[in-house]
């Protein structure tokens, strides 16, 4: 059918699609026949074989039979492929007098879409007898009527058609009349009574005859009516209609009691024989219910609403009768003019309420449209909104399929309300709309998406195991199981990272937990990837990076690297009494395993044998003289340096230093024990003797050890090795503190030469031998620093 109206540009591609679609429609219909009144469930044909389809294909492709009208009178057995009757078929009810009686149907298959046209011819059986509308007919004939005159009689009706329909009329045997069966222009057979010889009222004033209507069935059926013939006195002229037939057109929406037409008949006789009255002649019940005629004026009035869609024209026979009983016949042909009073109809044959989002060209609905009006009033345009991903495909006989134009996206729109509009081309235009709701079923086409591509989590060290340290979150735009997200830890890229023992993740909610207590000093940070997978088929997944930064806590106290805190052999620093204020005695070197401000170290002098003599620089731990030394200052000093970090709460450590004041580096010295209490000096002479004896013995042993050490040093030509002046207790020459105060500023070396004279028993230190002390500066020449010549500094 040619589609009228505006064609949207977006629909121009439909022409090609339509050509492809129509190629799936079988144009030549398959034809079957069945006798009317056949029992329901009766076999009609083996449809699958006739269509060249396998029996299993009918079920797999959802084959079904669609009829042109609203009733489904046929059914398809998908298991056997047989076409069966759903109900008894009454040809007279379905088609009336129309012959042949054909029931049109379509066979629809999906995947791919195919249409097959079918026609079922309903064959008539002789199940109706001819019936006359009245039981008796009164016929008045003038006695001067001539032989050969025809007198119309009542028509019998037979609902059967063809050979089973009305074929002829007969009348009971008599000598004055016989029946002539004639064919009307409408195809009906009319009986006319033919006069065979003159009549004589005085001889026989009345005849009673039986009119028989016979059909052509086997055996034939018949109907009868009694015909009474009255012989009338002479009335020379019968009424004659001025115009016959009359033709008139009436709008189907004309109001009741509207005048249709006025007929006029004249009788040239005088008196009562010239008086004419009008009436309906041999009118059917339908005509009697629809029209009436004024007996005096001959005006035909409308008694019942007209309906063009049911009856398009009426043939009304009018009889004009004079006072003498003569009558004339006239015909009025009333044509009903169609008006656009029927909106289009939309009949849905198949509807799919849910379709998958990834299936283009999916059939959503199959429907047909019709308009009971005619002409332009019956032409229709079917459309849907342009902004929907659906298209209408016309098939045949006003059948349409609604299919998806492209793959749908449930996440964009999970439901579509489609309004199918059918508009006729009448004036005014009438429209019918049908709303269809289509649910889009989800397909797993969206992977879970993390809210962030990377997450940074902070965990303070020494945490409790199973501590919740953070969460990751991913969402999936799908629905149902396709949107259920499961979290997991992915294998780390670093094979040495024991991820399985560090963290775990809750698979349901993405919460991350620390499995053990973390130690900043062992592991400052680590990163890993987490995965989020949905439960679709196949499952989709995504990844995100998680960085875990371990926050330091002040859980490490400062550790003193130098001087070594060895209680058995403490280090002793030598300071010449001639040292200037600010003289560097030594440097306390400490480290802290923490970081940040927890590792910022500060130094302070906690205890001193003589307060005010020495000072400690707070930032670098350098111990320097605070003033000039004097002879009154004690020779031995004990300093306790406190090293404290900047944590909260702060942690600390102490370093004990022994300082020995010497007049010159040539005099012997030994680390002396702690000063005796004041009360222990009572007997000074005894103490001096004991000390002298111990000193001589110790010096001897010490001298031997020094001699051996010097020999070894000379052989190995070791450069500078910072050592305490006491045996044992070596320490490294360069130390680094984490607070940024640097290392020991210098490296120093010295030699001690020991000579002994057995005759005198006197030890003498030789003048110390020093290498040139060099001061190096980046980018400068190396120069000798004379300031340190012939001086000894211990660090």
Curated annotation (Swiss-Prot):
Gene Ontology molecular function: any one: calcium ion binding
Cytoplasmic topological domain: 711-795
CDD domains in UniProt: Cadherin_repeat
Subcellular location: Cell membrane
Domain Cadherin, residue spans: 34-132, 137-241, 246-346, 351-450, 455-560, 567-670
Keyword Membrane: yes
SMART domains: CA
GO biological process: calcium-dependent cell-cell adhesion via plasma membrane cell adhesion molecules; cell adhesion; chemical synaptic transmission; homophilic cell adhesion via plasma membrane adhesion molecules; nervous system development; synapse assembly
UniProt topological domain (Extracellular) ranges: 28-689
Record PANTHER family: CADHERIN-87A, PROTOCADHERIN BETA-4
Protein name, UniProt field: Protocadherin beta-4
Source species: Homo sapiens (Human)
